[in-house]
């Protein structure tokens, strides 16, 4: 079973995370590298599904849907337009991953979002 798990960012944590890891606008990093740092750092670990913790990314795709730096890296690597929105990226990720289940922690979206 393929699961797309999405959670929203907590601004102060992302700022502290980037400071702790020396991430700036000039940092050269890929989506996979930044994503792995987030997972290793324990971001939202109490909410993440166990396969994400075990790095079984072929079964679970976990992302922080409104963490701009992360999502824009994914968008660039997947050929999305530079002016795409976080929602555009989110939908593209679901279409790309083709999950059986969408597990979303952002209460602002209703099921008809997808």
Give short role names for the model-derived ranges.
Residues 19-38, 45-52:
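Short amphipathic alpha-helix
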Residues 1-25, 61-72:
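Short, solvent-exposed beta-strand-terminating loops
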Residues 8-11, 39-55, 64-114:
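Extended catalytic core of nucleotide-activated donor transferases of GT-like folds
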Residues 58:
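Short phosphate-binding/catalytic loops that engage adenosine nucleotides
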